[in-house]
Amino acid sequence: MKIKPCKSQVFRLEPIIGSRKYINYFWSFSIFFGAFGFLIVGICSYLKKELFFFSAENIIFIPQGAVMCFYGIAGIFLSFYLWFTMILGVGSGFNEFNKNEGIVNIFRWGFPGQNRRIKICCLIKDIKSIRIYIRDGISPRSALYLKIRGMPDIPLDVIEDRFNLNEIEKRATELASFLRVPIEGLE
């Protein structure tokens, strides 16, 4: 189910992509094929034969071949995990702000089980502020949080693009003016 963004004077609907990002598809393919190569080379070192394009003449099975098999199996499981989260759409959902009813609904899909559907409802009048979080360094990250009385901060969106500070500020300003609340976190 694809949700289209909707903005008006009294209603906002913001879709959240979650784990279905292009970079996750890239990494799941890359990890799978790299791990598959490790596994094939490990098997070739055990059988002392060439399979496909993989040659393991100079690799002794114990310890190098066994370690390559282990890394290959671990990488394949990791790529299956990434595919599983993307197929299920973990982290995807929507943020709904409705001034007519005076409520905010935040919905996300989780992993299968008891808490597969994560839904948070609150009143607009209970919102204290919009908080901007920015972390620089090796893995930069930016996020918008909703600060609500009596609840922990709720992440609205995570933006992993390090050069898009203007977009983060713009989104926070639009949402804060829509909800008529202050912005925190920018110095």
UniProtKB/Swiss-Prot annotation:
InterPro entries: PSI_Ycf4_assembly. Keywords: Chloroplast, Membrane, Photosynthesis, Plastid, Thylakoid, Transmembrane, Transmembrane helix. It is found in: Plastid, Chloroplast thylakoid membrane. The keyword Transit peptide does not apply. Belongs to the Ycf4 family. Seems to be required for the assembly of the photosystem I complex. This is Photosystem I assembly protein Ycf4.
